[in-house]
Design a protein with these regions (language model features):
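Metal-cofactor-dependent catalytic cores
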Residues: 1-248
Length: 248
């Protein structure tokens, strides 16, 4: 039916991405280390203790430059290395107050002056700060991405969708038919919950942080702004690149 092509996590919400070869999945939980931290802005009082909507955070829909951040996380030492094409690399311990201050100073040039400014780097306590109020993992279909790129007439990067899992070997939009059903990736079962409604973040190039593609306009030609699906793991296990995908 298809296979697991790529695994990605985003340790700081909207601030970088990291590719993985394998990952341990726990039933009912978000992807380990995904959206484990988030950056609140000065109009929010969120502290990470409970899940709150994305409007509380600095994010790519308001600050497209954030989309070009890459991140590597050494969890053993709790050290993150962030890079951006317009900024020097930054190495921080995300739980260290002094490093949190350095991080906020580092990303300040990426936040437009007419937007709420970043205020705090907070750890998500109850669950990863995904865009759903339930623990979710985002699953994308490369065939659907190619359909959008073809509609645009542009060779756009799939990284602008900020998925956790990329699947290949499927038909375009096949993932939409999975909503309300279970799929297996390797030996792990997931409940596909709903489609993901997309925002302006996807219009920004993940290499440059510049808006350069009308992804939302392309989706609207199909009568919606939805791309990828949210799923919740029903069982635990290890996923690896190349694992098969099938409906159950």
């Amino acid at each position: 039916m298809g296979q697991l092509l790529e695994i990605w996590r985003h340790p700081i919400k909207s601030h970088g991405r990291e590719a993985l070869d394998s990952i341990e999945i726990t039933a009912g939980k978000t992807l380990p280390g995904d959206r484990a931290y988030a950056v609140t802005h000065d109009n929010s009082d969120a502290d990470g203790s409970t899940w709150v909507p994305c409007q509380n955070f600095s994010r790519g829909s308001k600050a497209p430059g954030l989309m070009a951040i890459d991140l590597a996380w050494d969890e053993t030492q709790n050290i993150m290395t962030l890079s951006h094409p317009k900024l020097p690399d930054l190495i921080i311990n995300p739980d260290d107050p002094a490093d949190q201050k350095r991080f906020l100073e580092w990303e300040t040039p990426l936040i437009p002056d007419n937007r709420a400014q970043s205020a705090r780097l907070v750890r998500a306590v109850s669950q990863g700060m995904t865009d759903t109020d339930y623990p979710s993992i985002t699953i994308g279909n490369m065939s659907s991405h190619r359909a959008v790129a073809q509609k645009l007439g542009q060779d756009i990067s799939h990284l602008r969708w900020r998925c956790n899992f990329w699947l290949d070997g499927l038909g375009p939009w096949e993932e939409f038919e999975w909503v309300g059903r279970d799929i297996m990736i390797g030996d792990v079962t997931f409940e596909v919950r709903e489609r993901c409604v997309r925002c302006l973040a996807t219009t920004a190039n993940p290499k440059t942080g510049v808006r350069d593609a009308d992804t939302l306009g392309a989706l609207e030609t199909w009568g919606h702004r939805e791309f990828t699906v949210y799923a919740t793991p029903k069982t635990s296990g290890t996923l690896r690149l190349g694992d098969p995908v099938q409906l159950t």
